[in-house]
UniProtKB/Swiss-Prot annotation:
ATP-dependent carboxylate-amine ligase which exhibits weak glutamate--cysteine ligase activity. The keyword GTP-binding does not apply. This is Putative glutamate--cysteine ligase 2. GO terms for molecular function: ATP binding; glutamate-cysteine ligase activity. NCBIfam families: gshA_cyan_rel (TIGR02050), PRK13516.1 (NF010040). Belongs to the glutamate--cysteine ligase type 2 family. YbdK subfamily. Homodimer. It holds the Pfam family GCS2. GO terms for biological process: modified amino acid biosynthetic process. Transmembrane segments: none annotated. It comes from Salmonella enteritidis PT4 (strain P125109). The keyword Nucleotide-binding applies.
């Protein structure tokens, strides 16, 4: 199967996708009513899109193409408002977080959608287990070769993005001991983790053609790498973040990725090499397991650095780019988060340590998303 030509898009434009949890009070388990909400809110949208994801307990909010984080925030805020209104009318809740802390995957209903039903046929129970919730950020690129360079550059900071956004410590009623347990769910999939090495867009087109020989790949959407190019949109898509508990944090993460993309493509601080990925999964694991307290290792020098310290260095590097893009508020907020030493996974554990229950935790998450 041939790959579409890379659609030229304006560099550094943004698109944000948030996979939200649809909750059924008063037990605060996952609901199976996303179709009801989607039908209710679609006629009210003036920008962006609200659509299905894999199962009926998932609802995806997606912006249109945005020039900056302020425009993205306005679109997401408008969608948030109509979703919350419809959820209230149907006695449902909405919240963020990378996993629901006590749902049972066996109860999840795969959406009545041709693509998802085909995926269920290919992957069986793994698809129901993939009822987890992430944030994806698209960044516009001028051409395919820039997209491949940007993908490799951003891959250096996958642990940083995971650690900052980690919000999935609980799963199936248990503390997983991970800051981000969500990404572990995908470890059984054949396309888990980093994209196979290519050095330019022509090589990527050849890679895609060979992957399509498996008959499991019909489009880019069927490849679930941590970061992937999207030729139809003319973007690079970062897919490793847990869905945050607040819209503000989602915007901050998008601002960081946009600013990092600008820094990478204007400064070209790395010469991508296949050996860059030698310790990729080890460093990714550190971020998932320990969050900002994780330790990453340089594949060339063996130097070991605490993720919190290296994240502060990244934030300093991208600050000039953030100012040019109007994303400096995002960098300032994330810098403060790192200096305070926490992420949302840590907050969740503190809630439970203070005597809260998992049911109470989900209730609190719904209140946070509703701004209560």
């Amino acid at each position: 199967m041939a790959l579409n030509d890379f659609h030229v898009s304006e560099p550094y434009t943004l698109g944000i996708e948030l996979e939200m949890q649809v909750i059924n009070p008063p037990g605060y388990d996952l609901s199976q009513d996303s179709s009801t909400l989607i039908d209710a809110v679609k006629p009210q949208l003036t920008a962006g899109e609200i659509k299905h994801d894999i199962t009926e307990s998932m609802l995806e909010m997606a912006t249109g193409v945005c020039r900056d984080i302020d425009q993205a925030a306005a679109q997401l805020s408008a969608m948030q408002h109509v979703i919350l209104q419809a959820a209230s009318e149907h006695h449902l809740g909405i919240c963020g977080g990378g996993t629901h802390p006590f749902q049972k995957w066996q109860r999840q209903e795969v959406c009545d959608n041709e693509r998802y039903q085909r995926t269920l046929e290919n992957f069986g129970y793994l698809i129901q287990q993939a009822t987890v919730f992430g944030q994806h950020v698209h960044v516009g690129c001028a051409n395919g070769d820039d997209a491949i360079y940007l993908l490799h550059g951003l891959s250096h900071f996958v642990p940083h993005f995971i650690a900052l956004s980690a919000a999935s410590p609980y799963m199936q009623g248990s503390d997983t001991r991970f800051a981000c347990a969500r990404l572990n769910i995908f470890s059984a999939f054949p396309d888990n983790g980093p994209m196979p090495w290519v050095s330019n867009w022509q090589e990527f087109a050849g890679l895609f053609r060979r992957l399509s020989y498996t008959t499991m790949i019909d489009s880019i959407k069927d490849l679930h790498w941590d970061i992937r190019p999207n030729p139809a949109f003319g973007t690079v898509e970062v897919r490793v973040m847990d869905t945050p508990l607040t819209l503000d944090h989602a915007i901050n993460m998008a601002g960081l990725i946009q600013a990092t993309a600008h820094w990478l493509l204007t400064e070209r601080p790395f010469k991508p090499q296949e050996q860059d990925y030698l310790l990729y999964k080890f460093n990714r694991f550190q971020a998932c397991r320990y969050g900002l307290e994780g330790v990453i290792t340089d594949a060339y020098t063996g130097d070991r650095r605490r993720l919190a310290d290296d994240t502060l260095r990244l934030l300093d590097n991208v600050t000039p780019s953030a100012r040019k893009l109007g994303a400096d508020s995002a960098i300032d907020a994330l810098r403060l988060q790192v200096k305070k030493g926490g992420n949302e996974a840590q907050y969740m554990r503190e809630f439970i340590a203070d005597g809260g229950s998992l049911i109470g935790l989900v209730q609190k998450h719904c209140e946070i998303w509703a701004g209560q």
